[in-house]
Amino acid sequence: MHIDALSRRLIDRYQHGMPLCAEPYRAMAEELGCSEGEVLACLEQLQEDGGLSRIGPVFEHSRAGASTLVALAVPEARLEQVAARINAFPEVNHNYLREHRYNLWFVLTGPDRAHIDALLAEIEADTGLVPLDLPMLHAFRIDLGFPLGDPS
């Protein structure tokens, strides 16, 4: 995937937050020295190319409810079926296949710990697999950004 100069500047500047105003794309364009149409076209292209999955807020989950990292040891023959079932839960995000006995890893979120516990029990009942529940005890550093900078 080719990332042009405008895309790099756009990602570097706004991956940690967008302008909170009535016309955020226009404000972004003004700051970047281009048109609103160029910003929108750039974002569309990034999404089409698979370089951008979504535009939206990221919430501090510990203030809004509960979450946990979950791992399942899924037999290879059942991976697609189990992954599809896990993905059907709206509370699931970041579902990844890993090379390990515990090979399916995902994050569960909910309004409180009781909800998480109920989801874990439902996942176990639905799949016959015992979830490994790994709640975060302390965040040392969380930065979901990846600075691209100038490639030259």
Swiss-Prot record:
Lineage of source species: Bacteria, Pseudomonadati, Pseudomonadota, Gammaproteobacteria, Pseudomonadales
A Pfam family it matches: AsnC_trans_reg2
Sequence similarity: Belongs to the Ahb/Nir family.
Reactions catalysed: siroheme + 2 H(+) = 12,18-didecarboxysiroheme + 2 CO2
Keyword Lyase: yes
Subunit (UniProt): Probably forms a complex composed of NirD, NirL, NirG and NirH. All proteins are required for the total conversion of siroheme to didecarboxysiroheme.
MF terms (GO), sorted A to Z: lyase activity
Source species: Stutzerimonas stutzeri
The protein's name: Siroheme decarboxylase NirD subunit
Documented EC number(s): 4.1.1.111
Phenotypic consequence of gene deletion: Insertional mutagenesis results in the loss of respiratory nitrite reductase activity in vivo and in vitro. Mutant strains synthesize a periplasmic cytochrome cd1 that lacks heme d1.
Function as written in the Swiss-Prot or TrEMBL entry: Involved in heme d1 biosynthesis. Catalyzes the decarboxylation of siroheme into didecarboxysiroheme.
Organism domain of life: Bacteria
Keywords per UniProt: Lyase
Pathway(s) of this molecule: Porphyrin-containing compound metabolism
InterPro entries: AsnC_trans_reg2 (IPR040523), HTH-Siroheme_Decarb (IPR050684), NirdL-like_HTH (IPR053953)
